[in-house]
Amino acid sequence: RNGNFYRADGTFIKNLKNDGPLKPSEAEKVFQGGNGPFRTLDLSAEQSAWTSAITFDSQGFPHIAYSLYLANDDQRYRLASWDGAQWHDREIAYAGSRLYDREASYTGLITLDPQNPQHVVISTDVDPSSGVPLGGKHQVFRATVDQQDDTGSIVWQRLSKDDNQHNIRPMVVRGDKHSVIMWLQGQYNTYTDYDLDAVGLSF
């Protein structure tokens, strides 16, 4: 803000012009991942976390949605919310398996409504609440997630209808007259080999 870096509580960290870029060690830690050594090209680092979305609520408090790698066929979605005094970091959904071989941490992704961070949209190939497989293809779900919610208390609504196609990479698009949840639908083999359409639903 105004050329400065701050922690979530407003504590000044440094000035970009005078002090240079922010180092990871200077930033505020929200989640501690694993510290294990390199394993293989087919596995991700232990408990590696990937940020997918960051937005602010009406009070200006940040909310961070991210994925957490546990295994190639077991990833989770988490949401960290600042309440003005502390972070509330919790698991909110099963993210399912990796999208394809050699990219162990690639998920269908999680996103937040830019006007309401409690409105969460995800893509997963398992039941978001139980982790039971859906049949191989990723589907898109949405839910309202309160600060005290976790995987067991959230009610997910499925949005995508096609069981035979991948439904991935959702985003919430807000406009003056219309608001739309969009995602990519089709065949996704790798990040350079895909045949996808952009589809969406108004809400």
Question: Where are each of the predicted segments found?
Answer:
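Extracellular, repeat-based ectodomains that mediate carbohydrate processing or recognition
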Residues: R1-F203
